[in-house]
Amino acid sequence: MRIMFLNHSFVHHSATLETHIRKLLAGYASPDTTFELAYPDDLGGGAVLSLLEERKALSGLHHILETPALVQKAIEAERSGFDAVMQSNTFDPGVEASRLAVRIPVIGLLRASLHFAASICDRFGLIVPLETHMPHTMRLVQAYGMAPFVCRMKSV
């Protein structure tokens, strides 16, 4: 199986970090599964992202702005023969829109993690990187129908 591990940002990781990510992914997969790291093109959201980062106002808008580039990359993955796309960002940017555009599975880590947690316990908490992420995260949790399982959310 060949899976595209799609970074949400057009900013490329260092070679050292990419090697580390590949090792982590290989540790979770069967021997015949390969992961290829991919990055979307900057279709104009980069300037807005930089401004939001400067203001420390990352509220989810930046993920919405990334969606067209992520959908474009999912279409490219399907055309290139990938069996699936896995979104690297835990806020699942572009996942729903990409699912509408392709016939291969597009996996969002947040949704997959929420459902896994709900399969092994009745209630769980979430940790998000910034307090400004909390409203967007809760909207996603509610959209996924998982709010009854989440007992608390905290930023680090």
Residue positions per predicted region:
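Short alpha-helical
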Residues: 92-93, 132
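Short, well-ordered beta-to-alpha junction loops that form the rim of enzyme active sites
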Residues: 8, 88-91
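N-terminal glycine-rich anion-binding loop in soluble enzyme alpha/beta folds
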Residues: 1-64, 129-156
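Periplasmic-binding protein-like
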Residues: 79-89
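Short, acidic/small-residue loops that bind anionic groups at enzyme active sites
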Residues: 97-121
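Short, well-structured alpha-helical segments in soluble
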Residues: 53-81
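General beta-strand structural signal in soluble alpha/beta enzymes
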Residues: 37-38, 86-87, 106-109
